[in-house]
């Protein structure tokens, strides 16, 4: 089944409570934790993640875009998010990070990989991974378009992982390019403006979910 995880950072930060109220019919909420060092932006911190978790029953997936992901393992486990990943580029020992999340009870654990990082950097962790996030825009490029070079990386990962690992694509995905993303081998996408930039975010999410599920069915992966 196709999964859609709208990114809360694309909603109005001045009215985050109102945005959160409008997400209650979603199946996932994506939270970017950016520290201003690994990437230039600063988004949500652990206090905000904890506040969101206390005020919604929607499963939360957290994408750590930080220099020291190990520092976030304990808080994430205490908060009880549903899924968490960090960038392979920021992890000297990715296996240690993944094992720590697993021991802490995080349901889904993963790695993220930047646009220009070779896909080979993640392939050896297949036995520990539940999912991989492929960042499909240039780093620090909020709002820039999807980069098609991501598709070949997803294809290679799907060939290597088979069906064992869920493949997510994050950045610039919309209703137009989603079929290409699914055909390349992705099962899930993170979107921002494609949902929260619309007049009716829930209706937009439902349209994207239908496109994704229809494409998976055509590919024989429903």
Name each model feature, range by range.
Residues 1-85, 91-93, 109, 117, ...:
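Conserved N-terminal beta1-alpha1 strand-loop-helix module at the mouth
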Residues 34, 43, 108, 141, ...:
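Short glycine/serine/threonine-biased micro-segments
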Residues 53, 101-102:
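A generic structural signal for well-ordered alpha-helical segments
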Residues 80, 105, 185, 190:
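Conserved functional loop/turn residues at catalytic and ligand-binding sites
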Residues 96, 103-108, 217:
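Short acidic, glycine/proline-enriched helix-loop-strand junctions
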Residues 133-183, 187-188, 194:
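Active-site/ligand-binding-proximal alpha/beta "capping" segment
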Residues 210-222:
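Generic C-terminal helix-cap and adjacent flexible tail
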